[in-house]
Every structure is written in structure tokens, then in C-alpha cells.
Amino acid sequence: LRFDVSPLWLGLGVLFLACGPGRGDEPCDAACPEGDVACRERSCADTTDEAARAAKDCSEMPAGGRCLGTRVVEWCELGVFLREDCEPGATCVEEGGVARCAEGTACVEGVTRCSGGGWELCTDGRWQSRECAAGCVEANGRGWCGEPGSTLSGIVRYARRGPDAAFRGWTPEAELVPAGGFLVASYRDESLVDLGVTDAEGRFTVRVPDGVAEEDRIVVYAAGRGSGTTVTYAVADPALSGEHRVPAVPGASARIWSWSRSRRSLVERPVFTIHESEGSGAAAVFDALRVAWRQSRERYGRTGLPVVAWLGFGTTWSCGACFSATPVTAAGRRWEAQVWLPGDTDAAWWSEAMVLHELGHWVMSSHGTTPNEGGPHYIGVPTFPGQAWSEGWATWFSADSRGSSRYYDRQGGTMFWVDLEARKPSLGMWSRPKPGEGLLQRIEENEVAAILYRLGRGTASRQPLYEALAAPAMNASPWARGYLRHRWRMENGKVVDVRETEDPAPCLADFLDALMCQGFPRSVMDAATEPAVAYPYPSHAPLCR
């Protein structure tokens, strides 16, 4: 659920991150070169529990390290267990007994190639060999098992906008960007001839019938397949108009967003451009959806719930933008989760930050447990712990997926932003928690996101944060900190009719416990929470199950 822009601003000013304690007043990482995160982790792993965890992990570690999934390298150095995330475009490879990040090895799910005489398919984000008795044949950049016959190649791109340099509106001119990871189908009349996928640069090659016919066409779909052959995530037009209360029943003609061109036009000029007037905003949403799907798979080694994102131009929703793990059968298949995105004049579909925020809720629902504590919430206004945890995680996931600390959106004709690194909003003041009000105090969701952002930046890998979300302690009710879900409503910008239920719910403190119980460095935790002046999390005494 998006937060609302509100004139009710609360805050204590901006407080900045400081290093954890060392000897006396000296930070624990004082001797480390700037940017040397591995040195910081060695120097600041200052508790018996952390050392014991490292010793256990290192006793099982191959001498040259190992890959954890596609994007994380694990190794031990001087008895300290370390992890590092590979940069975008790189994957973890194990060669000659050594695990490392290799540049240029990432690929788009479903793309094929010929390599070393063999046929390879991109599976789970990396190239995997496949049996091919007929021999691999390369045609226009795509690998085929055997001769493919007649093919057509091209490139797909779409028009998109983003925030302008001042973050006051969308860019006045759209730019054309590659449409990577989109499904591409070749048809003769209604008969499917071939189905492929665009690579990271938007390039595709598909089989076509011999001889060009007027009924031949190429269709690009805003849809993706997981590791199988079934479409598992897509952007769809709900075939509705006006405002609707969620969860809304899609119209009978609801369909996955697609764009069609004649084969003949692409033979003459093999560039498939999706323009704004054709709904390129849906293509932009799919780009964000694909990023979230890939991030989820890389971090957890498994796919999330099959999800559809509803975007209809001129269609709005009672929640603004929101997510729910509510199943629906529509647009040709059953989906286990839905995202509703507004199609009004704010053109918020251009906000990759907002779309990925909603998909952060999808990640939590797919791999963790949601607090199910919903309701209106406003920038700068502390809310209840369950909602703050859910919304804060979603905003952090958006930041992590984009590699940016700045969240941005447009509502009611107003563009606004929040910077997690600086703890600074574009409007009003930042609200900080108070150490005297305990772990279950109301807390502003962006403060939760800022804490998570610092936790992620304090180590060379964000993998511990994703693992903590899926930890058994975060998925077993009741939760250790004892928080109970609340219900309330808003009246004139104020919380009224607050009611505590008997339903347990997870909150930020439970998540921090899960992190610490897995051996997370105390110094990094304290630097993020600042317990003496802000959130009073006791890193020395986590509740472990």
C-alpha cells in the first residue's frame, strides 16, 4: 500500500549513521581502509556468539569458497565467515575450486545460445548445458537444438519516462529503452509457430513459416515464465474503467498487455517500438516486475507466488496502489497474488520505486509472513509496528532492487521523494523513534526502511536480511516480541478508534532478533538502530528460538 502525502509532518530532524564502538571511543573499524567491508566485518565481529557462528560456518566451507545461488559468494578469511553480492551483470561461478563473481555471465531467463559446441539455456539466471543430440545451431544470436528453419530477428524497445533531475515531475521527453525479458510469439493466423524471449538488449529470434503471408504477425507480451513453461508473472489490463474497490473482479475481456506487428513490417525494419500511445507504461511496469521476480529467485532459490499486476489507463483503485495475496482466475490463468496500480493522470506507472515497493509486499507474502495490519498511513507520521514493518520492508526492497536510496512517487499532482540514506524527505521533517518508548512503539515506516538500508550497507552482502525474513522465527505465530495486531481508522489525518486484537503479528524487533540470532554483527546493528538516541533494540540480548 502506498503511503499518502500528508500535511501532518512530524520529526526530530536528520540523524546520521555512526560506526559501532571499538576500544574506548575508537570505532571498531578505525584501522580499516575506506570501503573495505570485509575488514569491517572482521574487526566488528565482537561477540562470542558471532565468533562461534563464524567458526561453525568456516568448518564446513571449501577452501576456495562457494556460491550461494546465483549472486552470492561465500568464503572464510582468518576464521571469519564472509559473503559478497555480485554486481548486476555478474554471477557467482566456481572454477578451479575457487568461487568468484564473474562479469558478463548473467543472462535472461529462457534465452538460449550455443557455447563450446553445446546448447545452453539460461535457467535461474545463469547458463546451463542442455542435451542436444542434433547439435547446436546458432541463428542470429539464438541457439537452437538442430536446424531451426526460417527465422525472424529483431529488437524490441519501449518509450519510458522517469523522474526529472530535480524530482519535481516526469521527464518531458520519453526515451527508448530495451525491452528485456518479454515473451515474443510468432503466429500464422491464430496458430502459434514459436515462442521466445528477448535478451537484456531486447533482441529476439523466432521461427516463422516459410514464405511471408499477410496473416503472419509477431506479438510481444508483458509476461514472463519462471523456470518452467508456464507464465507466472505478468502485467494485465483489467478491462475496467473508473474507480473500483479492491479486490475487484476483472472484466470479462481482461488480458495480458501485448503489442502486435506484422511480420512483413519487421522484415522491412526489424525494430519493434512500443510507443506511449500504445501503453508503454505497462511495459515499464513489467520491467520492474521482472526485476522483482529475478531478485526474489536469486535470494531464495525458488520462485514467488504467481502474480499479476493490474494496470488500466483510466482505471483507479480504492487503495491507490496496493498488493494482496488474493487468488484470481483471469487473463487466461490462475494467479495467487495481485498488484493494483493506478492509471490516472499522475502517471505513477513511471515510478519504478513505487511499483517495486508493492512487489516488496509480494516478496514478504511469498517468502515470509505479512503482519496483515493495514490502513491509511502518511509520510512522517509514525504508525503501528506491524504496518510499519510491512511498509518499511517494501520500501527497502524497492531501494535494494534499484540500487538507490531514493524513493519517489507522484500523487494528486504532486511529486515527492524520500531519501533513506540521508533520512530526508522532500517535504516536512523525518520522524525518529524515542529510546524511552520501547520496541513496540509506533514508528514511521521510512525509519524502518532506513534502518534496513543501513543494515544492508553495513555488510558486503544483503543476503542475511533476505534470510531473516524467511527464518523459522519470523514465520511461526506467536512471535517472540509479543506484538498484537491493531485496527483503526483515520479521521482528519488522525488515528481514531484504535483497537488491539488478539491476533499476533511480526514487527521490526522480531526481524532484528532473527538477524542477530543468525550471527549478524552487533556493531552494524547498533549503527543502524542507534539505540541510545533512537530505536532501542538490545543487540546484546536478542530473543532466539
Tell me the role of every PLM-derived stretch.
Residues G24-P148:
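Cysteine-rich, disulfide-bonded extracellular modules and peptides in secreted proteins
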Residues A159-D189:
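Short, ordered, surface-exposed loop/turn motifs in non-cytosolic proteins
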Residues Y187-R207:
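Short, acidic Ser/Thr/Gly-rich low-complexity loop/linker segments typical of extracellular
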Residues R207-P209, T273-V308:
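Zn2+-dependent metallopeptidase catalytic core
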Residues L311-Q338, W349-W350:
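Catalytic zinc-binding patch centered on the HExxH motif and its immediate surroundings
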Residues V339-V355:
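Short pre-active-site segment immediately N-terminal to the catalytic Zn-binding motif
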Residues A353-T370, E391-T395, A399:
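Active-site recognition of the HExxH zinc-binding catalytic motif
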